[in-house]
Every structure is written in C-alpha cells, then in structure tokens.
Amino acid sequence: MKTDYITSDPTLPPYLVLPQFLLNLDVRFTAKEVYAILLDMVLNSEAAQTDQQGRRYLAFYNKIIAEIIDRTPSTVAQSLRELEDVGLVEKKLIALHTPYHIYIKLPAGEDTP
C-alpha cells in the first residue's frame, strides 16, 4: 500500500466512524466493528429501509454481514447478541425464511454521528 503524509487539507479514503461511546463498552472488538459497519449502512446506504414508525433498519442475513467484515456468520451472530444485550441492536423476525430486520440504536442522549 502506498502511503502519504496527512496535510492541512487531506483527501481521505472511505472510512468508518467508531462512536466514542463504544470505546468503554464491555463487548468484544468484533461487536464494535459490526456496530460501526451497521451504523454506517443504516445512515448512508440505500439498503436501509424505513418502517411505519419512521425508524431505519437493515434486512440482512448474518452471512452477508460476515462477508463484509471477513468473519464467520456465527461470529456475526455472537456479535449481534452482544450488541442486543447492551441495547444497541434490536432484531425483529418478520417471517420465517426471511432476514431479520436489524435496528441500530444509539444511547439515549447521544447525537447521531
């Protein structure tokens, strides 16, 4: 990879935002990585959908997320469970044999990144 110094007017490559509240959260780094990717997708992707209450969500199988972060689907499932346990992700099964609707949540009082 070719590198260069950062100047006062840098051209940045595509990047993910890692919200600061994740730094002290007691979950594995992979869960933080999954959260950052899903947050980016729900805020910036055409794949995000909106429900009847105006809440944005993603409809993906774990396999798709696993391919994005180069992990196994079971690792993604474990990360999503960790995020659910701390209240940052809510999964809703709409029908059998369909992907979960994955709602990405922010801590109350935090501004949207």
Protein language model annotation of sequence segments:
Residues 108-113:
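Short, amphipathic alpha-helical interaction segments positioned at domain boundaries
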